[in-house]
């Protein structure tokens, strides 16, 4: 493992490893630790008390962050008929049906999210599943990207709705904003995420569900969080 440079070590020295920070404390500190020359993304990492090898214990859901993510989301919509106009009016970046499917199959990937109406899913599954699936872009009802309300799906993604799911180690990684956000807005986004995560707890998961949590930025050290809300020294 490569060693961290002086800058990183200096920032890490500002984090008390014997303390669990309240989200308000951590949100203020994470802004101080974001010293890169770009607006770093602020992320939270939750270790869950699940067995990710068991499909009935996997966690997946969506949440609308009240203050958005701070990034511009390019949305592609695969639909036809009157839904095309509805998607365009809602701000979709690219809209189409069969021709868009063929375009994506040919290598077009200038988007961050894909939504679709149910009538297009058979073709999408046949032609795009292997391409979009590994990238986490395949439309799915569970992630709120398949449905009849294309305008609502587009607006939700543009406004800051994110999808969360555990990885193969039972950890959920999710963005909650940018380092330029007010600390109170980061805290509010965190609270929305943790509420959604708790609501997605599988019925088969036993014991403590939220094992640990850390707040971090793109280039900064992680900050341990107190899951009970108050700081723990």
From Swiss-Prot:
Keyword entries, A-Z: Repressor, Ribonucleoprotein, Ribosomal protein, RNA-binding, rRNA-binding, Translation regulation, tRNA-binding
GO biological process, one term: translation
GO molecular function: rRNA binding; structural constituent of ribosome; tRNA binding
Pfam families: Ribosomal_L1
CDD domains, A to Z: Ribosomal_L1
GO cellular component annotations of the record: large ribosomal subunit
Function: Binds directly to 23S rRNA. Forms the L1 stalk. Unlike the case in the Thermus thermophilus 70S ribosome, this protein is not seen to block the exit path of the E site tRNA. It is clear that the protein in the structure is flexible however, so this is probably due to its position in these crystals. Protein L1 is also a translational repressor protein, it controls the translation of the L11 operon by binding to its mRNA.
Assembly and oligomerization: Part of the 50S ribosomal subunit.
Family the UniProt entry places it in: Belongs to the universal ribosomal protein uL1 family.
Protein name: Large ribosomal subunit protein uL1
Organism: Deinococcus radiodurans (strain ATCC 13939 / DSM 20539 / JCM 16871 / CCUG 27074 / LMG 4051 / NBRC 15346 / NCIMB 9279 / VKM B-1422 / R1)
